[in-house]
């Protein structure tokens, strides 16, 4: 992190009459020249050197700050020979002081994105598909197949997260309890200390505040055998398997494993997970993605992905969100579910059977792919995932 004291010293010049303004490079150069301190000699020298290059014009015009930072680090090294152990931190401060914008680290981006990932979900099977969205006021909207009442969420209130299964939808309430719509019969979890929920084909998985996992419902493949799991911080239910992320970055999995989708024992430094049908994917701390399972179809391109902050494994494709708000995808595109090339400013993504769902920063939702059941008809949705005063 940038040294707080030094950052405050540099920012003092940006305060006039109690109101914060953003500096021009010339004014910042004068300030740095007049405020040299021995303990900040290295920082001042580096910043002054950067301000004397043409790199400032890129900071001034940059739309994607994270990409601009990487570009400038390389340019400063290759073209100007400017290298410092704190180069990245100093550039971050230039963005903050000159543009008034903070460049988030991958870890910060992932933490911010995580709550938005819980605001959209897609349930699917061979006979139907539906999309669910959580509105800012705690209400839930749903569109698509409703043969079992899975879209009957109109009366829900105080919801903080949603998850969709093939014929049912789950909402996590503010008090830590669950509410279910659709054809689950007597399948219910009555605990009130739940922090996350994920739905499989016929099973419900819930993460408790104590790091334990409850899983009930169909267990023909052992997908509910989570009783021995401990220190779990994230969960994901696939069609017939369940995956859990431990606090130490390792991953546990149980259930259907004919394609090797549960072979995650060797995974390390994982920060997020997603279970699909024949594969499981995880994000590593460095922003790359790892996969287990049927790699022939769904893993072929992900080894080149970088700066990933969210990932979702579908039935026959995988979709991921980059730190810059763009979306990458790999796998089958038979129904156009991979047509995300022009997507920008997204804050959450989900993969379904033949669909990809994306939540934009403005609170709208876009769905591409098959629309046989009307699951793409989200054009009227507003304020999904946003905070409203």
Which residues are covered by each model-predicted region?
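Charged, amphipathic alpha-helical regulatory modules used
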Residues: 1-110
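Short glycine/serine- and acidic-residue-enriched loop/turn motifs that recur at repeat junctions
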Residues: 125-130, 134, 144-155, 182-192, ...
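Conserved core positions of repeat-based scaffolds
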Residues: 130-133, 142, 168-171, 180, ...
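Intrinsically disordered, low-complexity repeat regions of secreted/extracellular protein precursors
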Residues: 150, 168, 173, 208, ...
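Repeated scaffold domains used in trafficking and secretory/extracellular systems
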Residues: 159-160, 194-195, 232, 270, ...
């Amino acid at each position: 992190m940038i040294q707080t004291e030094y950052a405050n010293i540099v920012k003092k010049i940006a305060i006039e009459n109690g109101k914060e303004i953003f500096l021009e490079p010339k004014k910042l150069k004068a300030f740095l020249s007049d405020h040299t301190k021995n303990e900040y000699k290295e920082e001042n020298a580096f910043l002054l050197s950067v301000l004397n290059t043409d790199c400032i014009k890129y900071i001034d015009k940059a739309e994607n700050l994270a990409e601009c930072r990487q570009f400038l680090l390389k340019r400063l090294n290759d073209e100007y020979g400017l290298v410092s152990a704190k180069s990245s931190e100093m550039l971050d401060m230039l963005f903050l002081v000159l543009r008034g914008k903070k460049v988030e680290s991958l870890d910060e981006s992932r933490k911010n994105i995580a709550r938005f990932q819980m605001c959209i979900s897609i349930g699917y099977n061979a006979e139907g598909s539906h999309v669910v969205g959580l509105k800012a006021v705690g209400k839930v909207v749903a569109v698509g197949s409703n043969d079992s009442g899975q879209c009957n969420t109109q009366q829900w209130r105080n919801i903080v997260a949603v998850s969709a299964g093939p014929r049912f939808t789950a909402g996590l309430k503010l008090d830590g309890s669950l509410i279910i719509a659709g054809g689950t019969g007597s399948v219910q979890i009555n605990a009130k200390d739940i922090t996350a929920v994920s739905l499989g084909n016929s099973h419900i998985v819930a993460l408790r505040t104590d790091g334990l996992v409850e899983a009930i419902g169909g267990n023909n493949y052992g997908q509910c055998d989570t009783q021995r799991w401990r220190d779990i911080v994230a969960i994901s239910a696939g069609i017939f398997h369940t995956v859990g992320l431990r606090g130490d970055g390792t991953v546990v999995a149980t259930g259907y494993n004919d394609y090797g989708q549960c072979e995650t024992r060797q995974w390390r430094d994982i920060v997020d997970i997603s279970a699909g049908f024949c594969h499981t994917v995880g994000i590593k701390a460095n922003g790359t993605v790892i996969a287990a399972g049927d790699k022939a179809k769904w893993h072929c391109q992900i080894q080149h992905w970088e700066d990933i902050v969210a990932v979702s494994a579908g039935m026959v494709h995988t979709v991921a969100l980059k730190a810059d708000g763009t979306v990458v995808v790999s796998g089958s595109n038979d129904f156009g579910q991979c047509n995300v090339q022009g997507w920008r400013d997204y804050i959450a993504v989900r993969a379904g059977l033949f669909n990809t769902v994306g939540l934009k920063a403005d609170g709208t939702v876009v769905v591409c792919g098959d629309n046989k059941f009307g699951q793409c008809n989200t054009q009227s949705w507003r304020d999904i995932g946003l905070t409203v005063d």
